[in-house]
C-alpha cells in the first residue's frame, strides 16, 4: 500500500514509523487523525489548565457540589477547616497557577485540648502535645492503684475538642492485718493497713526473735497489698561458753548466752589473735564467726638445760614471753663446763623456737698421783656422772707417813690446794687469761710468793698474791675479768648505771615513755670487752589507736578506746537513773508531808 499524497507538502517517512504504532494501539485507522487527537488532548495542560483540586486532610471545599474536572488558570476555590482544626491564615483558598498546579498555604492547624490537670498520687504523661488526635497516659505512684482509664485522646466534641476519658483516681493500696506468730506478738491493732505502714514484733520472755523485727505493707502486681519481709519467728536459742586457749574475755561474761549475745576476746601476752575478736550467738545455737584462736608470736617455754642456770636478771621463768631476737645466756653449774667452745646462749628465732644448745658436761678432778704418800680417806658426793672425783669430793692423804693433808675438788675441775703431792716443791703457778704473774725462779717454787697482774682493760678477781706451802699454792689462781664501758643509749636507761662493768655483768635496757626497744632487751659484758649481743636502740613507737599528724614530727592524734567510751556512757546513764530515783523519792516524801499537814 502506498502512502497518501499530501497536498502542498512532502511526506516524511521517518515520522510515519513513529506515529503509526500508536494509531494501532488506539485503533485509529488514520495516523494523521491520531496525531491531531493527541495534540487536542494535551493542549489544555500545555496552556495551564488544572485538574480536580487535591483532597486536604485539614479542610474541605465550601462548595461541596463541585463537579468540574478542569479549571482554568487563575481559578480560586474557597475552603473551610474540618472539625478538630482551626483557621490559622486569613486566606483559605486554593489557586490554579500557570503550571497547571493548585497552590495554597496551610491555613488550618490542630485545635488543642486543655491540660487535664494534676493526678493526685500519680503522674500524667503527655506523649507529644495536647493537639487534636494526641494521646496522654495516666499512672499511679508506688503504693497506689488506678481507678479509671489509663489513657485519654484529644477528640472532636460538639464544636470543639476534648478528652475522650476524664481524669482517673489513684487509691492507696491496703494490707490485711499482719500474721500472728507463736510465742510473740506485733504492735498493730487495725483492721486494714495502708501502704507503707509498719508493725514491730516482739517475743515472749526467754524467746529470741529470728528475722526482721519490723515488717511493712508493700504492693505486689501494682494493686495487691502484701507484708514484707516475712514475719519473724520466736525461738529458744542458747550458745555454749566458748573456750579460747591463751585468750581472755574483754566483755560478754556470763554462764548463759542467748541469741545475738556478743563476746569480745583478746589474747594473752606473747600470743596474737587469729580470727574475729567479736563473736555473737547465731540462730543455729553456734557462734558466728567461729571463736578465734590465740597463736604464739613469741618464744615461750624456756629450754630445760641440765646442770645450768640463766644469767639474765631478773631470772627468766617458764611463764615469761620473749620476742623474736631475744638472747638468753646460761651458765654451767659448778663442776660442769660448756660442752663446746661456742657461746652459751640461746636465741628466739622467727619460727618461735630457741636455737639449739650444747649444754654442760661434768668437769672431773684428776686422780691424784702421790709419791711417798697415800690417800687415807675419801668422801664423795656421788653424782650421776662418769667422774672418779667430782666437784665437792674431798680426800685426805699423808706424806712420808708423817704429815697429813686434805684437798677438795673445785668447781673448775682442780683440787684445792693444788693437785695433792708429797714434797716441798710447788709446780709452776697456773697461767691466767689476760694476765700474768711475777716469779723469782724459772724452774720451781719453794716457799716463794707470786703476784698476779691483769692486762690493761681487765680487773683481777681473787687473791693476787699466792704462796707455796707443802707443795701447794695457798689459793686458786685469780681471774682477769674484762671491763666493758657504759653502753651509749639514747632515749633510754640502764637497769644498773655505772661507768664500767665487769664480765659477765648483765644489764637490762629500759626505753623512755613512747619508745620501744629494737633488739635484745638484755645485754652482757663479754670476755672481749664488748657487749653481747649488740647494744639495742630505743626508737619512737606510734601508740595503738593513734596516727601521725605531721610527717617527721612526733605529733600524734589519738582516739579514745571504744571500751572506755562505752563504760563512760554506761556510768553516765546510771547516774541519770539514780538522779531520777532520788527526785521520785523526794517527791513522795513531800506528798506524804502535805497529807499529814
From Swiss-Prot:
Gene Ontology BP, a term: negative regulation of complement activation, classical pathway
Domain annotation Sushi: ranges: 49-110, 111-172, 173-236, 237-296, 297-362, 363-424, 425-482, 483-540
Keyword entries, A-Z: Complement pathway, Disulfide bond, Glycoprotein, Immunity, Innate immunity, Repeat, Secreted, Signal, Sushi
Molecular function GO labels: RNA binding
Domain of life: Eukaryota
Glycosylated position list: 221, 506, 528
Major location (coarse): secreted
Location(s) in or outside the cell: Secreted
One matching Pfam family: Sushi
Annotated disulfide bonds: 50-96, 81-108, 113-154, 140-170, 175-217, 203-234, 239-281, 267-294, 299-348, 332-360, 365-409, 399-422, 426-468, 454-480, 484-525, 511-538
Subunit structure: Disulfide-linked complex of alpha and beta chains of 3 possible sorts: a 570 kDa complex of 7 alpha chains and 1 beta chain, a 530 kDa homoheptamer of alpha chains or a 500 kDa complex of 6 alpha chains and 1 beta chain. The central body of the alpha chain homomer supports tentacles, each with the binding site for C4b at the end. (Microbial infection) Interacts with Staphylococcus aureus protein SdrE; this interaction inhibits complement-mediated bacterial opsonization.
Protein task: Controls the classical pathway of complement activation. It binds as a cofactor to C3b/C4b inactivator (C3bINA), which then hydrolyzes the complement fragment C4b. It also accelerates the degradation of the C4bC2a complex (C3 convertase) by dissociating the complement fragment C2a. Alpha chain binds C4b. It also interacts with anticoagulant protein S and with serum amyloid P component.
Protein name, as recorded: C4b-binding protein alpha chain
Organism listed in the record: Homo sapiens
Protein's gene: C4BPA
